[in-house]
Amino acid sequence: MTNQKQTTHFGFKSVDWNEKEKKVAEVFHSVAKNYDRMNDLMSLGIHHLWKRYTIELSHVRPGQSVLDLAGGSGDLTRLLLQKVGDSGQVILADINAAMLHVGRDRLLDEGLFKNIRYVQGNAQCLPFADNSFHCITMGFGLRNVTDKDEALQSMYRVCKPGGKLMVLEFSTPVFPGLKPVYDWYSFNILPKIGKFVANDEASYQYLAESIRMHPDQETLKAMIERVGFEDCHYHNLSGGIVALHIAYKY
């Protein structure tokens, strides 16, 4: 159980453990309406390739049940719906009501409403029965969770035996010379894009800082295996700017 007295990081700041969740909620409430446009601008559209790659490696089949955790505006959910078909189900879960509404409205506007459930829930204490899902995806959400170990334990609990966990997240660049360039872009350009497009420089400053504070590829791999998942491996995408971790519950 989480020690409620300790502190944690919010970007580069040290905050009370209980305060981080509130601050992260404020960030995503602020960015929700511009979330998709900002993702396109910040990544030059490459985030769509990362997400498609993730779903291709999911090997989700018709009839299966999938949890898209921190599903936000629904990018992964849309792709997963094509995989599970009419006999399957995708649950789009997010702790943030504003992001959940954006995802629901966007998918409804695209005519996607069958076999989707929307659930507001905390990754650290998922409101689902044990052994519920064939696959759990989490795209760009884990770094915002206060207690990552507790969240991973919760994911393990609700994953079916034989099921798969897929965590797509910003990570540590591995190409020589890429990290200083990426750092410069993250701290000098991203907040300015946030300021001019979304009138919200502070939230995108947090984004850059949260990426730097997130565990690197090997550390996250060890964290995933520590809660019980096995055969964890990862794929570095765009030189390690993003990593896709895949693990199994046997």
Curated annotation (Swiss-Prot):
Keywords: Menaquinone biosynthesis, Methyltransferase, S-adenosyl-L-methionine, Transferase, Ubiquinone biosynthesis
Gene3D superfamilies: Vaccinia Virus protein VP39
Pathway info: Quinol/quinone metabolism; menaquinone biosynthesis; menaquinol from 1,4-dihydroxy-2-naphthoate: step 2/2; Cofactor biosynthesis; ubiquinone biosynthesis
GO-annotated biological processes: aerobic respiration; menaquinone biosynthetic process; methylation
Assigned EC number: 2.1.1.163, 2.1.1.201
Catalytic activity: a 2-demethylmenaquinol + S-adenosyl-L-methionine = a menaquinol + S-adenosyl-L-homocysteine + H(+); a 2-methoxy-6-(all-trans-polyprenyl)benzene-1,4-diol + S-adenosyl-L-methionine = a 5-methoxy-2-methyl-3-(all-trans-polyprenyl)benzene-1,4-diol + S-adenosyl-L-homocysteine + H(+)
A GO molecular-function annotation: demethylmenaquinone methyltransferase activity
PROSITE patterns: SAM_MT_UBIE (PS51608), UBIE_1 (PS01183), UBIE_2 (PS01184)
Highest taxon listed in the record's lineage: Bacteria
InterPro entries: SAM-dependent_MTases_sf, UbiE/COQ5_MeTrFase, UbiE/COQ5_MeTrFase_CS
Pfam families with a match to the protein in the record: Ubie_methyltran (PF01209)
Binding site for S-adenosyl-L-methionine: 73, 94, 122-123
Physiological role: Methyltransferase required for the conversion of demethylmenaquinol (DMKH2) to menaquinol (MKH2) and the conversion of 2-polyprenyl-6-methoxy-1,4-benzoquinol (DDMQH2) to 2-polyprenyl-3-methyl-6-methoxy-1,4-benzoquinol (DMQH2).
Family per similarity comment: Belongs to the class I-like SAM-binding methyltransferase superfamily. MenG/UbiE family.
Record's protein name: Ubiquinone/menaquinone biosynthesis C-methyltransferase UbiE
Organism in which the protein naturally occurs: Legionella pneumophila subsp. pneumophila (strain Philadelphia 1 / ATCC 33152 / DSM 7513)
Taxonomic lineage from the root: Bacteria, Pseudomonadati, Pseudomonadota, Gammaproteobacteria, Legionellales
Gene: ubiE
